[in-house]
């Protein structure tokens, strides 16, 4: 196969340049397809209302819901992180993906029905209705925005930068800024519907490219049996450092783990202990899949509850594939390129990938640039760009929703739809600017622990949120005081672990971290279990010692009362009163509310084009504002969780089938 290589003077300095017509044509065709879908959604969907922009008008059927859930979850961090951890330690990291098969069913069957009957757009808004007060909603909004910027965006930016460096040799800043610009354009212009349609397209691009590369990789290594025959012998030949403080490196630092072929590992000595993987990971996954804005927003856009459940099942089936499309190819990359992917000498690793702690993160990009022929190499670049753009676009849109609905409306409670839409789009621009400013930090933090980084940060900050959401949905006795102080207490515990670990660093086998054992010895997933239990006990204890919330405020806000027909007195009703309506306080009201008419001269042609581009043209609807009866009918439709019994049985049987498949695979690779 033809390769375009610039030979460097040292190991790791080779640059494969995608400068041939076949690769360029594939990349151009992909971008034209994505832009075309985004423009189509601009014409097709209603972006002139808050509900239309943020919830896709509640019109999505099951297959784009499921594809969007999967595409929003699978970013370039998964390609780089899962393959890298697979190269470093074997199959166990796939447990992060297969655990989601069960948790995503909890989302569709237990959590989403309550979110729908509550009539909310954002998760902090649900807690506002459930508990009253402002401090929980504000706390969760700020925490979510913090996690978006410093974990999700940073991971995607880092992993995208790794791939671009390996595949293109372009300037990192120019490449990533261009990607962010394109992502921002179709996020700002298209709203959630554009994201969900482009997510669907990109899901197929991601899977097609990953399947092709997996086929090449298995062919190169000698098939499935060749992988398991050769992986334990995949060791670097360079094991002596010129640094006197390092010298001869212990074989335990460069030999593959003896338990590399097992998902469930020793509870004490394992790098992913099985109790932590089964329990601690479920807690962190529960936060991500059941209360994270990026994921839940996709479900809330579903046509009805049956379509949402079917979408969750489709997402679950898709989550079976990363083991075979990412983890195993990462292991194959170590077999094929042990001196690069499995490097252990600090100065060698520095030359190969720019960091001294290890280069396992280049496992997947290395396969692409070494194995793929012209055209297909361009396809894989398009796959990685699709993953990066999909994940970033999801974060931009969802963080825009959070900021607009949960923070800005506290500052401007009487803001109309037009102002809220404008602020939401400006927030996307601000997030892009922060992302670009964060690039030097991400580049300086290139280490061998990408997937551990995101999971550990989540384990230190997410369990209190998981505990509060679980208790909020299933324990009516929990009140605002208990929930708030449970969150605060959990945050303090998490920071007590997070700050020392990042101050001392995670270290490596060659140069272990100096972090005191009292703070850093406990595995981060074990710590997640401890943090979840402590936060839950604190929340329950304070709730039981203080006054309960009367049941009249809880109808359709807790799981046991999701079918209640009683009229609910919302604890946030004070925000709905006043001379001017607040369009963001009811999940259905804003979905039917058109932008307020402004008596002003007709805008010129240029301004009309700009307003249409941003989804703010008043001529798009072609109909008068809805009547009070129409608003009420729309609200009832959005909060309806009734299902056709026949289709409900179909999705229930499919859920059982998916769980059976998942249990078999867990047992087979245990």
Curated annotation (Swiss-Prot):
Gene Ontology cellular-component terms listed: apical plasma membrane
Mechanisms controlling activity: Enhanced by the interaction with PDZK1IP1/MAP17.
Gene disruption phenotype: Mutant mice develop glucosuria associated with increased food and fluid intake.
Predominant localisation class: membrane
The UniProt record lists the keyword Transport: yes
Pfam families in the record: SSF
Top-level taxon of origin: Eukaryota
UniProt keyword annotations, A-Z: Cell membrane, Disulfide bond, Glycoprotein, Ion transport, Membrane, Metal-binding, Sodium, Sodium transport, Sugar transport, Symport, Transmembrane, Transmembrane helix, Transport
Residues carrying a glycan: 248
Family that this chain belongs to: Belongs to the sodium:solute symporter (SSF) (TC 2.A.21) family.
Protein name as it appears in the record: Sodium/glucose cotransporter 2
Source organism (scientific name): Mus musculus
Originating gene: Slc5a2
């Amino acid at each position: 196969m033809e390769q375009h290589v610039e030979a460097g003077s040292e190991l790791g300095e080779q640059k494969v340049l995608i400068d041939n017509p076949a690769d360029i044509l594939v990349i151009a065709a992909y971008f034209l397809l994505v832009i075309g879908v985004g423009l189509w959604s601009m014409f097709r969907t209603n972006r002139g209302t808050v509900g239309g922009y943020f919830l896709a008008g509640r019109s999505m059927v099951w297959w784009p819901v499921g594809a969007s859930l999967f595409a929003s979850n699978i970013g370039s961090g998964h390609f780089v992180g899962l393959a890298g951890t697979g190269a470093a330690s074997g199959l166990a990291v796939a447990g992060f993906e297969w655990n989601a098969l069960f948790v995503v069913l909890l989302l569709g069957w237990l959590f989403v029905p309550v979110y729908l009957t509550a009539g909310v757009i954002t998760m902090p808004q649900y807690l506002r209705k459930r508990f009253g007060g402002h401090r929980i909603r504000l706390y969760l909004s700020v925490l979510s925005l913090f996690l978006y910027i410093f974990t999700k965006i940073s991971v995607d930016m880092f992993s995208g930068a790794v791939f671009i460096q390996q595949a293109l040799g372009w300037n990192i800043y120019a490449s990533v800024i261009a990607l962010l610009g394109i992502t921002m354009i179709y996020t700002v212009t298209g709203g959630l519907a554009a994201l969900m349609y482009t997510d669907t397209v990109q899901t197929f691009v991601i899977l097609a490219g990953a399947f092709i590369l997996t086929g090449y990789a298995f062919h190169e290594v000698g098939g499935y049996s060749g992988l398991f025959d050769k992986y334990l012998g995949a060791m670097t030949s360079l094991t002596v450092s010129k640094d006197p403080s390092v010298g001869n490196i212990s074989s335990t630092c460069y030999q593959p783990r003896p338990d590399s072929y097992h998902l469930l590992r020793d509870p004490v000595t394992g790098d992913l202990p099985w109790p932590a993987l089964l329990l601690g990971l479920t807690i962190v996954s529960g936060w991500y899949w059941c209360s994270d804005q990026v994921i839940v927003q996709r479900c809330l856009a579903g046509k009805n509850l049956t379509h949402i459940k079917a979408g969750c099942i489709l997402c679950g089936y898709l989550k079976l594939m990363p083991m075979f499309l990412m983890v195993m190819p990462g292991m194959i990359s170590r077999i094929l390129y042990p001196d690069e992917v499995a490097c252990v000498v600090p100065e060698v690793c520095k030359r190969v990938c720019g960091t001294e702690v290890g280069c396992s993160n280049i496992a997947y990009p290395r396969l692409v640039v070494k194995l793929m022929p012209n055209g297909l190499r361009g396809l894989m670049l398009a796959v990685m760009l699709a993953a990066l753009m999909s994940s970033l676009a999801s974060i931009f849109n969802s963080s825009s929703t959070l900021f607009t609905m949960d923070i800005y409306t506290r500052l401007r409670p009487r803001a109309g739809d037009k102002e809220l839409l404008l602020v939401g789009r400006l927030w996307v621009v601000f997030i892009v600017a922060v992302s670009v400013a964060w690039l030097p930090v991400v580049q300086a933090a290139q280490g061998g622990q990408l997937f551990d980084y995101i999971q550990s940060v989540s384990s230190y900050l997410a369990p209190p949120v998981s505990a509060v959401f679980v208790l909020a949905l299933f324990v009516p006795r929990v009140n605002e005081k208990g929930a708030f102080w449970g969150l605060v207490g959990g945050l303090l515990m998490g920071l007590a672990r997070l700050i020392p670990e990042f101050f001392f660093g995670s270290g490596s086998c060659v140069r272990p971290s100096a972090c005191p054992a009292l703070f850093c010895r406990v595995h981060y997933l074990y710590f997640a279990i401890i943090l979840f239990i402590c936060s839950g006990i604190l929340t329950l204890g304070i709730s039981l010692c203080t006054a309960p919330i009367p049941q009249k405020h809880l109808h359709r806000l807790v799981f046991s009362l999701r079918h209640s027909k009683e009229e609910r007195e919302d604890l946030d009703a004070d925000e709905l009163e006043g001379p001017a309506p607040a369009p963001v306080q009811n999940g259905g009201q804003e979905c039917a509310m058109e932008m307020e008419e402004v008596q002003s001269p007709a805008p010129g042609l240029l301004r009309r084009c700009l307003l249409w581009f941003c989804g703010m043209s008043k001529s798009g609807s072609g109909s008068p504002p809805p009547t009070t009866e129409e608003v009420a009918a729309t609200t009832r439709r959005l909060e309806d969780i009734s299902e056709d019994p026949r289709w409900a049985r179909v999705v229930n049987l499919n859920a059982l089938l998916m769980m059976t498949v998942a249990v078999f695979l867990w047992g087979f690779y245990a």
